[in-house]
Amino acid sequence: MAPINLNLILAFSLALLGVLIYRTHLMSTLLCLEGMMLSLFILMTLLISHFHMYSMAMAPLILLVFSACEAGVGLALLVKISTSYGNDYVQNLNLLQC
């Protein structure tokens, strides 16, 4: 396995570990999710160019669009929680249930 692929898989694993460990604040969870999406984007781009699958060239861009939408929704939720409750604890997400 190429060292760049190993580094990207390690970056994804560390970001996933960060999501599992830093669950108290929503901002740290969102940052770890963005790290996961960025490492997936770079890994997907490198694998497509390495295996010459140019018919799948739009897949990383679609992943990037979904990542931007996820970041926008996450930041909107962060603003809503922090203005309503004064903090960004993930445990406040249970209060948003209908």
Curated annotation (Swiss-Prot):
Family: Belongs to the complex I subunit 4L family.
This protein's name: NADH-ubiquinone oxidoreductase chain 4L
PANTHER family cross-referenced by the UniProt entry: NADH-UBIQUINONE OXIDOREDUCTASE CHAIN 4L, NADH-UBIQUINONE OXIDOREDUCTASE SUBUNIT ND4L
Transmembrane segments: 1-21, 28-48, 59-79
GO molecular function, one term: NADH dehydrogenase (ubiquinone) activity
Protein purpose: Core subunit of the mitochondrial membrane respiratory chain NADH dehydrogenase (Complex I) which catalyzes electron transfer from NADH through the respiratory chain, using ubiquinone as an electron acceptor. Part of the enzyme membrane arm which is embedded in the lipid bilayer and involved in proton translocation.
Pfam families: Oxidored_q2
Protein location: Mitochondrion inner membrane
EC nos: 7.1.1.2
The reaction(s) this protein catalyses: a ubiquinone + NADH + 5 H(+)(in) = a ubiquinol + NAD(+) + 4 H(+)(out)
Top-level lineage group: Eukaryota
Main location: mitochondrion
InterPro entries the UniProt entry points to: NADH_UbQ_OxRdtase_chain4L/K, NUOK/Mnh_C1-like
Enzyme class: translocase
Keyword Transmembrane helix part of the UniProt annotation: yes
Disulfide linkage: none
Keywords for this protein: Electron transport, Membrane, Mitochondrion, Mitochondrion inner membrane, NAD, Respiratory chain, Translocase, Transmembrane, Transmembrane helix, Transport, Ubiquinone
Claim: NAD is one of the keywords in the record: yes
GO CC aspect terms: mitochondrial inner membrane; respiratory chain complex I
Quaternary data: Core subunit of respiratory chain NADH dehydrogenase (Complex I) which is composed of 45 different subunits.
Signal peptide stretch: none
Topology versus the membrane: Multi-pass membrane protein
GO biological process, one term: ATP synthesis coupled electron transport
